[in-house]
Curated annotation (Swiss-Prot):
InterPro entries: Domain_X (IPR024937), Maturase_MatK (IPR002866), Maturase_MatK_N (IPR024942). It is found in: Plastid, Chloroplast. Transmembrane segments: none annotated. One of its GO terms (molecular function) is RNA binding. It comes from Pinus sibirica. Belongs to the intron maturase 2 family. MatK subfamily. This is Maturase K.
C-alpha cells in the first residue's frame, strides 16, 4: 500500500488518470487476502477461516477478468449453486475482490487526509468516533432546543457513484464500483431500487461506503455551520427577518452612543452544535422555536436536493431541552438546567458583578428505564422482578455475564448524574431477575440457588460501585468525589435495552406523522 500511496503522491493528475489500472494488479489482491486473513476487513476478528487454506490467486485473476469485461456477470452477492464465489459472507474470493476495490478507493482519500487543513473534518476510511460527554457538558448549558436526526441509509447506488465522481476524476475506476453496487442491489436479499448502507455491516467495503457517505453529508453541513458561527458581530437595530441582512446593514444610521445606548444591539448568531453517533445525530441549538423549525426544514431540503433523497419528516425530531428526555448516544438523558450564580469582585475598583450561567445537571430517568426492563421481560409493569425465560438455555456464566453487562453499562453511563439513588432500584431488579432466571433454569428456588452457588457469586457480578473502589482516593479526594461527578467513558458496547427503546420511539413518531 505504501507504493500505491507514493504512486498517488508523485502527481495528482497522474493519480486521477491512472487509478483504474490498480484494480487489476495481482499484488493488490494479495494484500487484500492478507487483510482478510488477519480479520482487518471487518470490525470483528474472523474466527473460522478454514476455506482459505485452498485459496487460489488464479481464481481471483479470472474473477478480475470478468470485472474487466464489464458485463455484470460476476457473482459476488447472489447465493446460487455450489459456486465458491457465491456467498459474499463466506467466500474468501468475494471478500478479497471487495477488499481490493476498497483499498484502491481509499488511496485518494487517505492522501487527501494528510494534506487536510488543521481543524477541518478529516477523512477516516472505516473509523469514525465522536466525543459525547464533553459535548454534553460544554454545549448543552448554552442550548435550549435539541434536534435528534436520523441519517437516511437507503440510497440509490448511482448517487453514491456520483459523489465519488466529484473527487475521483478517473471515470473508468468507478465502473467496478458501479458494477458491485448494482449487483448487490439486484441480489435476492435486496430486491429494491436502493441499497442499504449502514455502519452495522462488518465488511470493510460497506464501512467504507458508510463513512464516505456520512463524510459527504457532514462536510457540507460543517462548512455552513462554521460560516454561521464565525460571522462578525455587528451593531444593528432589530430586524423582523434576516433576509438580505448584509444589504440592510449598510443603511443603518449610526447615532451617538449617548442617544442610542438602548437601541443598538449586538448581533449574535445562533449557536448550533452538532455531534453524531452511528446513524443518529444530535443538533443542539440556542435560538427561537422558529429558528429550530427552519433548521429542521433545511436539513430535509438539503438531503432532498443534494442526495436526491426523500426524508420523512419524523427523521428529524425537535424538542425543548428543559421539558423532554433526550437520547444520547442511545441512552436516556434528562437534563435540568440549574442557574449557577458566580460573583466576581475587583480588588482595586471594588467592583462586584453577578454572573448567571446554566449548569448541566443530568438526572437518571428511572421510569423510562423501568419501562424498558418491563418490555424486555426483566420485570412486570409494576417493577416486580421476573425471570428471563429466553436466557434459561444459556450457561450460568453467560447468564451472569449478560446481567452484569447491562448493569455495568447503565452504571458507567449514569455515574456522572446527580441523584443516583434510583440506580440501586435498577440494580435490585436486575440481581433478583438474575437469581430467578438461574432458579428457573435449575428448576429450584432462589433460596436453593443462593445456597448452592453462594452469595459471593452475586456480589462478584453486582458489586457496589466497584469502579470507584478501584480508584486510589485519599480521604479528602474521596469526600470530594461524593460531591463531584465522575464520568466513565468505559462503555464496551451499547446497552441491548436501547434498541428496544429506540424502536418504540420511532414507532410513536411515525404514528404521530401518519395521523
Amino acid at each position: 500500500m505504501d507504493e500505491f500511496h507514493r504512486y498517488g503522491k508523485e502527481d495528482n493528475s497522474r493519480q486521477q488518470c491512472f487509478l483504474y489500472p490498480l484494480f487489476f494488479q495481482e499484488d493488490l489482491y494479495a494484500i487484500s487476502h492478507d487483510h482478510y486473513l488477519d480479520g482487518s476487513s471487518s470490525s470483528e476478528p474472523m474466527e473460522h477461516l478454514s476455506s482459505n487454506d485452498q485459496f487460489s490467486f488464479l481464481t481471483v485473476k479470472r474473477l478480475i477478468g470478468q470485472i474487466r469485461q464489464q458485463n455484470h456477470s460476476i457473482v459476488l452477492f447472489v447465493n446460487c449453486a455450489p459456486n465458491p464465489l457465491a456467498d459474499c459472507k463466506k467466500s474468501s474470493y468475494s471478500e478479497s475482490v471487495l477488499e481490493g476495490l476498497t483499498l484502491v478507493l481509499e488511496v485518494p482519500f487517505s492522501i487527501r487526509s494528510k494534506y487536510s487543513v488543521e481543524g477541518m473534518n478529516e477523512w477516516k476510511s472505516f473509523r469514525s468516533i465522536h466525543s459525547i460527554f464533553p459535548f454534553l457538558e460544554d454545549k448543552f448549558p448554552h442550548s435550549n432546543y435539541i434536534s435528534d436526526a436520523r441519517i437516511p441509509y437507503s440510497i440509490h447506488p448511482e448517487i453514491l457513484v456520483r459523489t465519488f465522481r466529484r473527487l475521483i476524476r478517473d471515470a473508468p475506476s468507478l465502473h467496478p464500483l458501479r458494477s458491485v453496487l448494482y449487483e448487490y442491489r439486484n441480489s435476492p436479499e435486496n430486491l429494491q431500487r436502493s441499497i442499504i448502507v449502514v455502519p452495522r455491516v462488518n465488511t470493510r467495503f460497506f464501512l467504507f461506503l458508510w463513512n464516505y457517505y456520512v463524510y459527504e453529508c457532514e462536510s457540507i453541513l460543517f462548512s455552513l455551520l462554521k460560516r454561521s458561527s464565525h460571522s462578525r458581530s455587528l451593531a444593528h437595530r432589530p430586524f423582523p427577518q434576516r433576509t438580505h441582512f448584509h444589504r440592510k446593514i449598510k443603511h443603518i444610521i449610526i447615532f451617538s452612543r449617548r442617544n442610542s445606548l438602548k437601541s443598538i444591539w449586538l448581533l449574535k448568531d445562533p449557536k448550533i452544535n452538532y455531534v453524531r453517533y452511528g446513524e443518529r445525530s444530535i443538533i443542539a441549538i440556542k435560538g427561537t422555536h422558529l429558528l429550530v423549525k427552519k433548521c429542521r426544514y433545511y436539513l430535509l431540503l438539503f438531503r432532498q436536493c443534494y442526495f436526491h433523497l426523500w426524508s420523512e419528516p419524523y427523521r428529524v425530531c425537535s424538542h425543548q431541552l428543559s421539558k423532554n428526555c433526550s437520547s444520547s448516544p442511545g441512552y436516556f438523558l434528562r437534563v435540568r438546567m440549574n442557574p449557577l450564580f458566580v460573583r466576581t469582585k475587583m480588588l482595586d475598583e471594588l467592583f462586584i458583578a453577578d454572573l448567571i450561567t446554566n449548569e448541566f445537571d443530568p438526572i437518571v430517568p428511572i421510569v423510562p428505564i423501568l419501562g424498558l426492563l418491563a418490555r424486555e421481560k426483566f420485570c412486570d409493569v409494576s417493577g416486580r422482578p421476573i425471570s428471563k425465560l429466553s436466557w434459561t438455555n444459556l450457561t450460568d456464566d453467560d447468564i451472569l455475564n449478560r446481567f452484569d453487562q447491562i448493569w455495568r453499562n447503565l452504571f458507567h453511563y449514569y455515574s456522572g448524574s446527580f441523584g443516583r439513588d434510583g440506580l440501586y432500584r435498577i440494580k435490585y431488579i436486575l440481581s433478583l431477575s438474575c437469581a430467578k432466571t438461574l432458579a428457573c433454569k435449575h428448576k429450584s428456588t432462589i433460596r436453593v440457588v443462593r445456597k448452592e452457588l453462594g452469595p459471593e457469586l452475586f456480589q462478584k457480578s453486582f458489586s457496589k460501585e466497584r469502579e470507584f473502589d478501584s480508584l486510589p482516593f485519599s480521604s479528602k479526594a474521596a469526600a470530594r468525589s461524593q460531591r463531584e461527578r465522575i464520568w466513565h467513558s468505559d462503555i464496551p458496547q451499547i446497552n441491548p435495552l436501547v434498541n428496544s427503546w429506540q424502536k418504540i420511539q420511532d414507532l410513536k413518531i411515525e404514528n404521530l406523522f401518519d395521523q
